[in-house]
Amino acid sequence: MQKIIYFFSLLLILGCGVNYDQNLLIAPDLSTQEKKINYPLDINFAVTNNLSDKLGEIRNLSGDLKGEIFLNSLSLDNMQLVIANELRNYGFRISNDKSLPSVEFEITKLSINTGKVAVSYTTELDLEFTLRVKNKGTINQISKNYTNTRQTVRPPEIEANERVLNESISLLLNEVFETDLLQESFQ
């Protein structure tokens, strides 16, 4: 009889231990999880521009309009591509279906100032935008401003300036995605 009680006690102890471990697996520490969409989510995505017919302004530091080398960087297609890639990195699948929840990126300001200061060339990018998420009849939005200054010893080239623009957008979107806007919008 004593052996039977010992055996069932052992099973009970082991059983509790297994349940305890399973509960730990079911409820992990939420503070250590990344703030990303946990499953692929289909969205409609668009970049809009309220800066008339051009995406932004390019000026040198003296104030004169200048900078043909930046024009490729400032194309709406390039912006759409960079932002779409960032959204994909966060687990979104982009679709043209208008019935899906939508993410809209509205550019409210984009300017690049370039010029020579002392012995180095300076590129200043100033980007301001509003990100809107529309889902189930509600609209959540967040506005951000970002300035990125880069100094080089050689005159800037198209590829280098496109990298500055892409990095700026990427950093800015990371800031936005670290807020709860997207998580709340798609719950």
Give each language-model segment a name:
Residues 84-92, 173, 177-182:
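Sec-exported extracytoplasmic/periplasmic mature domains
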Residues 68-98, 105:
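Mid-chain, structured segments of secreted extracytoplasmic proteins
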Residues 16-77, 182-187:
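A structural "domain/chain start" motif
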